[in-house]
């Protein structure tokens, strides 16, 4: 099979993996090397400086000895199979980089022969990119559950980010749908990655404080950091009966115990006939979107999972976003005065984000804020007005300050909106990398 045919097959197979995220690292270009990851983001995501960059998102192989019920590449499926050679994929990545099609690589894989054999091939590909071709662009590599600790350590020195898929929210569901994987085979590499990142960070901090090191820092800078962009993971939702309550509590635990940079949620998409899987073709994109919103609140707005959801109501509302839902269920905390409220309270107001709250705190030092000033600061005033006062005057006039009335004002169903579509799910939307190649 030629390289073009391999790429068409393996890029299409990679579209089911959604764990792409911005890197947050600042490795820049260097004389004699190619690419850079300065404030880098990745495919369909935004970097710290607002840029949207793309990755070559591909599987190393779709040959797999595992038989996960929901996976298109499972060993029991009769589908075309192929694999890249390490240098072949490295050359392909460089060709697309030189054509300015991509700025990095997102590499996942089926399990070819064994986890260790697969990881050895991936490491060789990344070694060629980094050491022979001097590629300094962003690389996100998926670690295969069951990979030995030595190989995982080597992978972490070549990739910017490593991720191990959690796959499913419970051990019971994992045993049912992924008979070749165990919770320990997934959690153990996560733990090793966490410890490797911490050890690398501590070692570099000690080296920076050492006078002898500082005197010789130029050659020492060539030492690669271990997974400098951290680790992430992904869970499939809707394939098994776990509730949003269970999923968000697991997500919260992963952030706290494994120091995850990101937990991704992927709405179950039916690609196989299997009695263990849900019947029908419904894709729960609305549920996925609400989980992402709740996850965002936990990461950046200092919400705890227990504040957003509980066992009494174990699923997030789909007709209203989690922040607005929390606010209308805690009306005793509102309205707040924007000119005096602490930053932490401003963050809890629907329509006021992190940047908006910081802008309010800064601007009110110079002048008292009203509607016009809030709009200029980027606040979503149409939503925020129900929960604030400006100079002592309530801004939500004309609407009763009760749960039912505010719910009617803030309800925002998403099934028919832009959040109800995603190229990787509803459309086979990964862009063609062949246009214009003669």
Predicted regions and their residues:
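Flexible, acidic/Gly-rich N-terminal and inter-domain linker regions that tether
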Residues: 1-63, 380, 388-389, 396-438
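Catalytic cores of alpha/beta
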Residues: 147-158, 240-256
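Flexible glycine/acidic-rich beta-alpha junction loops that bind and position SAM and/or redox cofactors
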Residues: 116, 169-178, 203-242, 261-285, ...
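Core AdoMet radical
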Residues: 74-89, 96-122, 128-149, 156-216, ...
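Conserved, mostly hydrophobic/aromatic
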Residues: 55, 68, 107, 164, ...
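Long, highly charged, low-complexity intrinsically disordered interaction regions
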Residues: 273-347, 381-420, 424-438
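Local cysteine-cluster metal-coordination motifs and their immediate loop/turn environment
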Residues: 62-74
């Amino acid at each position: 099979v030629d390289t073009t045919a391999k790429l068409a097959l393996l890029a299409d197979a990679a579209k089911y993996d959604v764990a792409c995220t911005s890197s947050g690292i600042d490795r820049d270009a260097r004389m004699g090397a190619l690419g850079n990851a300065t404030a880098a983001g990745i495919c369909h995501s935004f970097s710290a400086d607002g840029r949207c960059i793309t990755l070559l998102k591909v599987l190393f192989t779709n040959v797999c000895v595992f038989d996960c019920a929901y996976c298109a590449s499972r060993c029991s499926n009769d589908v075309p199979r192929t694999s890249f050679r390490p240098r072949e994929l490295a050359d392909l990545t460089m060709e697309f980089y030189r054509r300015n099609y991509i700025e990095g690589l997102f590499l996942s894989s089926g399990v070819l022969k064994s986890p260790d054999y697969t990881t050895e091939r991936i490491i060789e590909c990344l070694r060629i990119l980094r050491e022979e071709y001097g590629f300094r662009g962003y690389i996100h590599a998926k670690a295969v559950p069951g990979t030995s600790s030595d190989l995982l350590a080597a992978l972490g020195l070549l990739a910017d980010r490593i991720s191990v898929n959690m796959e499913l929210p419970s051990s019971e569901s994992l045993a049912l749908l992924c008979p070749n994987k165990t919770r320990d085979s997934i959690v153990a590499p996560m733990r090793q990655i966490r410890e490797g990142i911490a050890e690398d960070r501590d070692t570099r901090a000690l080296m920076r404080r050492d006078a002898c090191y500082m005197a010789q820092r130029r050659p020492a800078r060539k030492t690669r950091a271990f997974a400098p962009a951290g680790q992430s993971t992904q869970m499939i939702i809707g394939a098994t009966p776990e509730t949003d309550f269970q999923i968000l509590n697991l997500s919260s635990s992963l952030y706290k115990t494994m120091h995850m940079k990101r937990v991704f949620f992927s709405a179950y998409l039916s690609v196989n006939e299997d009695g263990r899987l849900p019947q029908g073709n419904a894709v729960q994109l609305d549920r996925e979107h609400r989980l992402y919103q709740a996850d965002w609140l936990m990461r950046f707005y200092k919400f705890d999972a227990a504040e957003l959801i509980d066992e009494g109501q174990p699923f997030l509302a789909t007709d209203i976003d989690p922040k607005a839902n929390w606010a209308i269920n805690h009306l005793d905390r509102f309205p707040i005065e924007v000119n005096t409220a602490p930053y932490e309270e401003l963050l809890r107001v629907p329509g006021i984000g992190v940047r908006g709250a910081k802008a309010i705190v800064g601007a009110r030092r110079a002048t008292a804020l009203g509607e016009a000033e809030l709009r200029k600061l980027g606040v979503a005033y149409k939503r925020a007005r129900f929960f604030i006062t400006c100079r002592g005057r309530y801004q939500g006039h004309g609407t009763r300050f009760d749960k039912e009335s505010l719910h009617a004002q803030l309800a925002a169903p998403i099934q028919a909106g832009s959040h109800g579509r995603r190229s990787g799910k509803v459309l086979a939307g990964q862009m063609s990398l062949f246009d214009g190649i003669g």
